[in-house]
Each structure stands twice: as structure tokens, then as C-alpha cells.
């Protein structure tokens, strides 16, 4: 068997998967592209195992191990995407980069004065200490905002 055929096919599969990871914005499509890249690696492992005529067939054994890891990865990845979709209402990667911590920091005005005992008061009533840790009532206000 010529090694060039599966190697070229694996390179094409890997490039298509890499393009999908870099160009797609949907988290599920990114996971599918990662799986495509893993399948390209598996094809290379089997092709080189056959080409080298390894008596232990370590390439094929490693391929089985990689398939098991990929199955676990896609299961956990889809569970995370589903949980994020339920909480945020979207699975677009660009919209998921903003976390709640950066949103809270952006709501503070620049001229917010320092309150008593080294705390900063936010417009919504949340207080943070001088070290940046939330005060006692920060959790209560976040729950009230979530119910609105």
C-alpha cells in the first residue's frame, strides 16, 4: 500500500477540521471539527502502522484508545454546550466569551467614590472590598437581577 494516499487524505481531513475550528462560531460545529481532526490523526496512526509493519500493532491500539477518549470528550463537550445554551440562550462562541465578572466590572462608573471601610459601591447596590472581593450583599442582588 502506498503511504501517500492515506497521508494526503488525512492532511485534507485535518485542514478541513482546522478551518472549521477557526471559522465556525457555533460551539457544536467546533466540536464536530475537532472530531474531524482527531479522525485524521487516527487515519495517520493506522496508515503508518500498516506501512511500518509493526508486529505489536501499536498504531491501531493507540487509535482505539483515541476513539475512546474522543467519545468521552464529545459527551462532556455536548453536555457543557447544552448547559450553556440553557443558561445563556445561545451557543455562539463570540457571545460566550464575556463572563459575568467582566459584566459587573463594566457597570461600575469611573467616578464611583470609595465608600466607608474601603468598599466601592456599585450603582446596583453591590459592594466590593478594596481587594476586589464581593461584599455580603453581592449574592442577594445578583439573585434579584436574575429573577427580573
UniProtKB/Swiss-Prot annotation:
Q: Name one Pfam family in it.
A: Oxidored_q2
> Region entry Disordered: which residue ranges?
96-148
Q: Which residues form the signal peptide?
A: none
Q: Which molecular-function annotations from GO does this UniProt entry contain?
A: NADH:ubiquinone reductase (non-electrogenic) activity; quinone binding
Query: What superkingdom heads the lineage?
Result: Bacteria
Its membrane topology, per UniProt? Multi-pass membrane protein
| EC number(s) from the headed UniProt entry | 7.1.1.-
Compartments, record wording: Cell membrane
Which residue ranges does UniProt annotate as crossing the membrane?
3-23, 28-48, 64-84
Matching Gene3D superfamilies, A to Z?
1.10.287.3510
Reactions mediated catalytically: a quinone + NADH + 5 H(+)(in) = a quinol + NAD(+) + 4 H(+)(out)
Q: How does it assemble?
A: NDH-1 is composed of 14 different subunits. Subunits NuoA, H, J, K, L, M, N constitute the membrane sector of the complex.
**Protein's job:** NDH-1 shuttles electrons from NADH, via FMN and iron-sulfur (Fe-S) centers, to quinones in the respiratory chain. The immediate electron acceptor for the enzyme in this species is believed to be a menaquinone. Couples the redox reaction to proton translocation (for every two electrons transferred, four hydrogen ions are translocated across the cytoplasmic membrane), and thus conserves the redox energy in a proton gradient.
Family recorded in the similarity comment: Belongs to the complex I subunit 4L family.
Tell me the protein's name: NADH-quinone oxidoreductase subunit K 2
Native source organism of the sequence: Streptomyces griseus subsp. griseus (strain JCM 4626 / CBS 651.72 / NBRC 13350 / KCC S-0626 / ISP 5235)
Which lineage?
Bacteria, Bacillati, Actinomycetota, Actinomycetes, Kitasatosporales
Gene field: nuoK2
